[in-house]
Amino acid sequence: MMQPKLLDKRKQKEVQYYLPDKEMSQKLANFFALFADKTRLRVISALSISEMCVNDLACVLDTNQTTISHQLQLLRNYGLVTYTRQGKTVFYKLATAKINQVMLSGVEYLGF
């Protein structure tokens, strides 16, 4: 059986140069895993439209507050959402429009 021909050395070095290192690969995997939960996706979608508090998100998404709070905590831990406090109410928003762009890229890819 013949061995498959490997890339030429120049191409191999080029590919290796542009590949993310193991640490970056892990960070990317963790980042994209945040989009692998339907509740988090819906939270991101809602926050791309308007800044909202937990109660409003729970109402709009027809999900209990505990679930929403848990998902927001994960999104906060990874820096996808930020918050401001107004009295006793905490309002959440996307940290950057790029978060919504990532999701919209997925929507576009799927042809919706």
Q: Which residue stretches match the model-derived regions?
A:
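N-terminal helix-turn-helix DNA-binding core of bacterial DNA-binding proteins
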Residues: 23-66, 90-97
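Beta-hairpin "wing" of winged helix-turn-helix
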Residues: 76-86, 93
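Hydrophobic patch in the ABC ATPase nucleotide-binding domain
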Residues: 21, 80, 112
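Conserved segment of winged-helix/HTH DNA-binding domains
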Residues: 16, 27, 93-112
